[in-house]
Amino acid sequence: MLDRLQAVENRYEKLNELLSDPEVISDTNKLREYSKEQSDIQDTVEVYREYKDVREQLRDAKAMLEDKLDADMRDMVKEEVSELEGQEKTLSERLKILLVPKDPNDDKNVIVEVRGAAGGDEAALFAGDLYRMYSRYAEVQGWKTEIIEASYTELGGYKEIIFMINGKGAFAKLKFENGAHRVQRVPETESGGRIHTSTATVAVLPEAEEVEINIHEKDVRVDTFASSGPGGQSVNTTMSAVRLTHLPTGVVVSCQDEKSQIKNKEKAMKVLRARVYDKFRQEAQAEYDQNRKQAVGTGDRSERIRTYNFPQNRVTDHRIGLTIQKLDQILQGKLDDFINALVMEDQAQKMEAAE
């Protein structure tokens, strides 16, 4: 571990030199790249330097115990040794976590896609519950939510809703929401009072910047059409809705939320870039993980990850076996218990894999 930490510190010092180089300063892309790399390892370097300082103090204190000391001084030094050993252990544990490979997408904004799946109208209503849950969670975090595209049902649910959450660290916290969410409840339209089971799927994509994935205009087919509202009726006579097709991958994105065709195209392009980037990211991850099954999935959207049981006010995350008896609060956006547990489980697995 110490060799790895020393290599990180050496790289940090090298980056300091590079960021002072006029050639780098004049190159916007290199400056951004090196600044981000330095920022990513800064905490590790600071804790490592503190760790080295504590170890040096500990060596000096232990060396003092080899000298002839009176009883009071020996007790003082022993107390100092005990305190320094505690600090050394704490810093060592922090360094183990800091050395866990960081997902380069963690700090990014996210595009979230929620779709009603099995269960018809009830699944669409549940998709609306999930959208509001994530919106409220984002609000608590101080993040901004913006709807990109929504396909409504007559009962007020969503066949599909795509929205962006802007905020640092959004992907780090929300990436574990990928998958199938199951709901068990008595539908409002059910006169017999029977519990129905429905599902909605959630996809969380990191926003892709133009420098990360270059989509050429010639590779995108643009189709325009009239926007439609609930039930499919036309809501305007202008061709403001936009459909983009990325020809090399077959990825298709539509947007009709704005009255302006230009704004719809801009929003659709954000989603298209994120989906194409995510497709390549998933393929690379699948190849890397083909012989290793991760317990905390962040990619398989067919995986049933969570059940929301309304009669028992209970939510269960099946990946980590965590059940919480406060469904009402969770749907109000109080997701920290689940998100923190999933992040900790992911870190523990990565630490184990790194050993």
UniProtKB/Swiss-Prot annotation:
SUPFAM superfamilies: Release factor (SSF75620). GO terms for molecular function: translation release factor activity, codon specific. The modification N5-methylglutamine is found at Q233. Coiled coil: none annotated. Keywords: Cytoplasm, Methylation, Protein biosynthesis. It is found in: Cytoplasm. Gene3D superfamilies: 3.30.160.20, 3.30.70.1660, 6.10.140.1950. Its main location: cytoplasm. InterPro entries: PCRF, Pep_chain_release_fac_I, Pep_chain_release_fac_I_sf, Prokaryotic/Mito_RF, RF-1. One of its GO terms (cellular component) is cytoplasm. Methylated by PrmC. Methylation increases the termination efficiency of RF1. The keyword Zinc does not apply. Belongs to the prokaryotic/mitochondrial release factor family. Peptide chain release factor 1 directs the termination of translation in response to the peptide chain termination codons UAG and UAA. This is Peptide chain release factor 1.
